[in-house]
Amino acid sequence: MAGPLRAPLLLLAILAVALAVSPAAGSSPGKPPRLVGGPMDASVEEEGVRRALDFAVGEYNKASNDMYHSRALQVVRARKQIVAGVNYFLDVELGRTTCTKTQPNLDNCPFHDQPHLKRKAFCSFQIYAVPWQGTMTLSKSTCQDA
C-alpha cells in the first residue's frame, strides 16, 4: 500500500520546493516579483550612484551650449541593473548655477535666483559603468525644460 502513495507525495514535495525557490516567493503582496538581473531601486547615497550622477551631469554640461554650469537639484529616482558591469538609471532635476563654464569647481556654486536666469531641466540618464576597469559611458540621455 506504500507504493500508491509514494508518487503523489513525491509530486507534492517537488511542487513545494518549486514554489519555495520561485522568484515570486520572496516578494511582498501587491508588489510584482523582482527579476534576477532586472533593474532595482538604488540609494542616492551609494558610491556608485554618486559617481554615475557626477559623470552624467558632467557630460550634460559638456554638451550644453549654456555659458553656466548646471548641477543636480534633486534625484527623483535612482535604479541600477547588474549586467557585465552596472547600468544606472537616474531621473534628475537639474538647475542652472551662477558658475560659468570657465570655473572648475561646481560643488559650491549656488543656483540662480533671478527669474530671467533661473532655469531647470528634467533629465533621464542611463550610465554604463565597469568599476573594475574604471570606465563609464553615458548610454542614453533625454532632457526637457522643467
From Swiss-Prot:
Q: Where is this motif: Secondary area of contact?
A: 81-85
Carries keyword Phosphoprotein? Answer: yes
Could you tell me which residues carry Phosphoserine? S43
Tissue specificity of this protein: Expressed in submandibular and sublingual saliva but not in parotid saliva (at protein level). Expressed in various body fluids, such as the cerebrospinal fluid and plasma. Expressed in highest levels in the epididymis, vas deferens, brain, thymus, and ovary and the lowest in the submandibular gland.
**Which biological process terms from the Gene Ontology are attached to this UniProt entry?**
defense response; immune response; negative regulation of blood vessel remodeling; negative regulation of collagen catabolic process; negative regulation of elastin catabolic process; negative regulation of extracellular matrix disassembly; negative regulation of peptidase activity; negative regulation of proteolysis
Extract the signal peptide range.
1-26
Write down the InterPro entries for this protein, in alphabetical order.
Answer: Cystatin_dom, Cystatin_sf, Prot_inh_cystat_CS
Q: Which GO terms describe its cellular component?
A: cytoplasm; endoplasmic reticulum; endoplasmic reticulum lumen; extracellular exosome; extracellular region; extracellular space; ficolin-1-rich granule lumen; Golgi apparatus
Principal localization?
secreted
Query: Which disease annotation does the entry carry?
Result: Cerebral amyloid angiopathy, CST3-related: An autosomal dominant disorder characterized by cystatin C amyloid accumulation in the walls of arteries, arterioles, and sometimes capillaries and veins of the brain, and in various organs including lymphoid tissue, spleen, salivary glands, and seminal vesicles. Amyloid deposition in the cerebral vessels results in intracranial hemorrhage and premature stroke. Cystatin C levels in the cerebrospinal fluid are abnormally low.
Q: What else is known?
A: Potential cerebrospinal fluid marker for the diagnosis of Creutzfeldt-Jakob disease.
The entry describes its oligomerization and partners as: Homodimer.
By sequence similarity, the record places it as follows: Belongs to the cystatin family.
Protein name per UniProt: Cystatin-C
Source organism: Homo sapiens
